[in-house]
């Protein structure tokens, strides 16, 4: 079995590829870098970003690329390129929602931030979230293919961050179907030991 190290800051973050490692039964070192250590660690990463997945000494980066790789490795990808296409498009769509909300929340001008947030609450988020709800409903509580895929792990890993960026602490109450993939992933017995020991600090 390869030596695997997952490098990230001392928080849950989003996407959480570690859940996929746990699902795959992969033993790994969960290396947490404190923020004061980051300037020293940063030059040793592929792109100066976190997270980093290290396999037998070689380092790889980008949350979604890592998740896609692990999904393929552990049987959570499509059975052909069209099924992979379906998974990729929904992952990109969920990430678009995250990115659009985050761009507003990280706006430095407070007044402009509120204007953009109100605009998105009126014109963007309802369409995006309703569409996502429709897709999960169509897929019987999963994000793609009507079965468990790595897209579900990305969605669940991102969900708390998404609620924060959208300013919707009751997001799963507004869209109850969102609870389905969350319950499916978090109740998986393969993840229990990892989830019990995983960082609780959010971001």
UniProtKB/Swiss-Prot annotation:
This is Glutathione S-transferase 2. Conjugation of reduced glutathione to a wide number of exogenous and endogenous hydrophobic electrophiles. Gene3D superfamilies: 1.20.1050.10, Glutaredoxin (3.40.30.10). Residues 80-203 form the GST C-terminal domain. It catalyses: RX + glutathione = an S-substituted glutathione + a halide anion + H(+). It comes from Manduca sexta (Tobacco hawkmoth). Glutathione binds at residues 8, 38, 42, 48-50, 62-63. The keyword Transferase applies. Pfam families: GST_C_3 (PF14497), GST_N (PF02798). Residues 1-78 form the GST N-terminal domain. Induction: By dietary chemicals. SUPFAM superfamilies: GST C-terminal domain-like (SSF47616), Thioredoxin-like (SSF52833).
